[in-house]
């Protein structure tokens, strides 16, 4: 006879993108000869508030935060874990972020329309001129081999309204990269996390900003070159989550930066020390010289 022991916690492999699923969605049963999982009836009886919603108890939410945080804040390239961490800590900041959106006419219109950026969206943007927000967003995605729908869906937030707020932040993150000409590499992802914390007070951005640099080979150089710029830009610029990006696809990206009160990092020597950033800026300069860039009132 084998003895099966129900466990609310399960063994997991932190290298797997799905390692948290047994932790929050199943009761695991161990025996001498086998390990199996079956749905937990207690979870299946909970109300689902939107498609894909996975309701969690407070204890499960805490475990999700710890499990995703241990790995996610050390490796910000693990988008699945960062997504889980941001949702499990959402109760701390999402209501405030939602209130920020309600404070501006543009933000209120976003919450009313609830637009989503999908793969179909970018097909329409490929015909725009270089230098427009929409076209540069397409170029940025293509350069990194990314697409809008590669972002993880929102699952663990109970309120449909706050779930959309999280989705909006998640879907527009790559537009922040585009706005500041930041490539999808670890140093620049961390720079953007610092900026997001300064701009929106996101806890997950703070955690990534504190622990993520431990993995950098040039920590001191990164700190000197990027942290002051990110903190200043996030603090002085408009709240990025309140921007209705879809209505600005055809706007010159330099003009948009001026409107939002933000600038790219033009500190002395930064381009020389960061090749990925330099490459994006050089492509832009070459297109400007050829007259193939939307004319903008911005130094380049």
Swiss-Prot record:
It is a peripheral membrane protein. Keywords: Lyase, Membrane, Metal-binding, Mitochondrion, Mitochondrion inner membrane, Ubiquinone biosynthesis, Zinc. It holds the Pfam family Coq4. It is an enzyme of class 4 (lyase). Its cofactor is Zn(2+). It is found in: Mitochondrion inner membrane. Its main location: mitochondrion. It catalyses: a 4-hydroxy-3-methoxy-5-(all-trans-polyprenyl)benzoate + H(+) = a 2-methoxy-6-(all-trans-polyprenyl)phenol + CO2. InterPro entries: Coq4, Coq4_euk. Pathway: Cofactor biosynthesis; ubiquinone biosynthesis. Belongs to the COQ4 family. Lyase that catalyzes the C1-decarboxylation of 4-hydroxy-3-methoxy-5-(all-trans-polyprenyl)benzoic acid into 2-methoxy-6-(all-trans-polyprenyl)phenol during ubiquinone biosynthesis. HAMAP family: Coq4. Component of a multi-subunit COQ enzyme complex, composed of at least COQ3, COQ4, COQ5, COQ6, COQ7 and COQ9. This protein may be expected to contain an N-terminal transit peptide but none has been predicted. PANTHER family: UBIQUINONE BIOSYNTHESIS PROTEIN (PTHR12922), UBIQUINONE BIOSYNTHESIS PROTEIN COQ4 HOMOLOG, MITOCHONDRIAL (PTHR12922:SF7). This is Ubiquinone biosynthesis protein COQ4, mitochondrial. It comes from Cryptococcus neoformans var. neoformans serotype D (strain JEC21 / ATCC MYA-565) (Filobasidiella neoformans). The lineage of its organism: Eukaryota, Fungi, Dikarya, Basidiomycota, Agaricomycotina.
């Amino acid at each position: 006879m084998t003895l099966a022991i129900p466990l609310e916690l399960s063994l997991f492999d932190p290298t797997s993108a799905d390692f948290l699923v047994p932790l929050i969605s199943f009761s695991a049963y161990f025996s001498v000869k086998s390990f199996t999982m079956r749905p937990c009836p207690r979870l299946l009886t909970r109300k689902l508030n939107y498609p894909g919603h996975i309701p969690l108890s407070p204890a499960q939410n805490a475990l999700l935060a710890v499990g995703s945080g241990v790995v996610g804040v050390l490796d910000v390239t693990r988008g699945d874990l960062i997504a889980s961490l941001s949702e499990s800590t959402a109760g701390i900041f999402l209501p405030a972020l939602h209130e920020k959106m309600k404070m501006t006419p543009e933000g209120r219109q976003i919450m009313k329309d609830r637009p989503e950026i999908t793969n179909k969206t970018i097909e329409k943007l490929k015909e725009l001129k270089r230098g427009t927000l929409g076209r540069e967003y397409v170029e940025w995605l293509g350069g990194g081999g990314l697409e809008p729908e590669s972002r993880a869906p929102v699952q663990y937030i109970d309120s449909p309204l706050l779930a959309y707020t999280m989705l909006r932040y998640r879907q527009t993150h790559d537009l922040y990269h585009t706005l500041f000409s930041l490539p999808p590499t670890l140093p620049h992802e961390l720079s953007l996390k610092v900026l997001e914390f300064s701009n929106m007070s996101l806890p997950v951005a703070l955690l990534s900003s504190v622990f993520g640099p431990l993995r950098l080979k040039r920590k001191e150089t990164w700190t000197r070159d990027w942290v002051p710029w990110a903190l200043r830009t996030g603090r002085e610029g408009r709240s990025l989550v309140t921007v209705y990006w879809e209505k600005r696809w055809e706007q010159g990206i330099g003009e948009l930066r001026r409107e939002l009160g933000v600038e790219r990092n033009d500190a002395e020597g930064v381009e020389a020390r960061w090749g990925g950033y330099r490459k994006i800026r050089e492509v832009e300069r070459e297109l400007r010289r050829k007259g193939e860039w939307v004319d903008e009132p911005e130094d380049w």
